[in-house]
C-alpha cells in the first residue's frame, strides 16, 4: 500500500506533497528505530538492575563501639564501622542485629549511614556506620537474619579519660621519615594535643621513639581481608578500592573512640603542622575558632604548601630548626578538619557528611591560620641546626606576597620544643635507639615518585589511589614493625557475606616493612 501511494505521488506534479510524504516516512522509520533501541536498552538496564539486586554482597566489620551513655547518641547505642561497595546503602537501609538478653532475644534494626555520601566516588569501596539502640541488659550482639546463629560482634567502649584536644593522624605505612614524625610529635605535644597514630608498618626504632612519648597512643591498622566464602570474585582485593589505606575509616574509628573524652578532635596527616594563632595552645585556638563560627560542627583549616630542610644525621637533627627553614610556595590545598565530636558522627579526609542537624562545616580564612604542609624536603650536606636560625623564624606567608609580619612560631615555643626533644633523645635507651635511626631513606623516595604519579599529578583523578598501586621491593635486614591480623567470615546472613576483624597486633621482623 505504501509503495502504491509513493507511485501515485511520483506520477503527479505536486512536489511539495512528495517532500512532505518522504519526511513523514523518514520520521516514522526513525521513531520505530528509536523505540526498538529503547526497548533493547530497557531490557539490558533491567537485567543489570536485576543482577545487582539479586547478587550477594561483602561487608568487612572493623569495630563496634558501645555507648552506655553519650553526648552524641541515645543511651545504649552501638555503632558498627564497616566497609563495603559504595552503593551498599542504596540496596540495604539497615543491618539486622539480634541482642541476646536474659529475657530472650530482641531484634534491632541498625540504620546504615555512608561516611562518604557522594556517588560516584572514585573508589569502589567506602566506609559506613550502622547505628542502633540496644537493650540495656544485652549479653551479646550478633548480626543475623535467622534464629539459629549469627556473627557475634566484638564490642568495645569509648575512651573515658578527658582530653581537651585529640589529634587523630592518618594511617602510617612504610614509615621511615623520622625527621618528620619526630617533629610532628614534639610540636603537637607542646601545643597540648594527645596524639593517636594508626600504623600499618614503620621502622622499629622510630616506632619505639614515638611510643615512648606519654602523649601518644598507637594502634595497629590492618589491611582488610575477605574470606574464601565471598560474594566478590576470588581475585578481588578490596584494599585496591579503598582510598589511601582506608583513611576515612581510620579517622572515623578514632572519632568514635574519643567522642566522649575529647572536647576537640583534629584530623591531620603527619606532614600537616598547625601552630596556634588564636591562642597559646590548641585548646585556646579551637575554642576561639568555634566562637568565630558558633554554628559549626567542623572547621576546616586549609593547607599552605611549603618546603623545608633537614638533616639525615640524628646528631645534627633539630625539629624546630627544620621548621625554621620553611619556605612558602604560595599554594593552598585541600583543608583538614577540626570537629566538636558531639556534633559530628563520622568524617572523610576533607569534609564531614555526618554533621548533626543545626550545625555546618565552616572554613577558617587562610590569612587567619592554616596548616603548614611539609611537602618538599631537602637534605643539604651542611648542618641545618643553629640557635640563631631557631631565634629567627620566617614570617607566615601563605600567598607568597610578603604580606604579614607574623612569625610562624613564637621564639619561646621554639626553644622549649627544642629543649624537650633533646632531653628526650639523650637519656637511657632512647639515646641508643635515636642514634640508630637510618641515614638513608629507602621507602620515602619510592613512595614520593609513586604518589606524584598517581595523586599529585592529577592525571588519574577518576581512579582509586593508594600505596597498593606502588611497586615496593623487599629490603631484607631492615627491622620493621608490621601488623598481623585475623578475620572471620559468616556466610548465613541473607545476601551478605560478613567478614569481621577479630584480632590485630604489632609484630617485629627484619625483612622490611609491608603494606
UniProtKB/Swiss-Prot annotation:
Protein's membrane topology: Single-pass membrane protein
Where does the protein end up? Answer: Membrane
Q: Name one Pfam family in it.
A: Glyco_transf_92
- Segments passing through the bilayer: 18-38
Q: Name one GO cellular component term.
A: membrane
Q: What is its EC number?
A: 2.4.1.-
Residue span(s) of domain GT92: 163-456
Q: Is-annotated flag, keyword Nucleus?
A: no
Q: Which GO terms describe its molecular function?
A: glycosyltransferase activity
UniProt keywords (A-Z) are:
Glycosyltransferase, Membrane, Transferase, Transmembrane, Transmembrane helix
**Family from the record:** Belongs to the glycosyltransferase 92 family.
Recorded hits in PANTHER family, A to Z, give:
GLYCOSYLTRANSFERASE FAMILY 92 PROTEIN, GLYCOSYLTRANSFERASE FAMILY 92 PROTEIN F59C6.8
Protein name in the entry = Glycosyltransferase family 92 protein F59C6.8
List the source organism. Answer: Caenorhabditis elegans
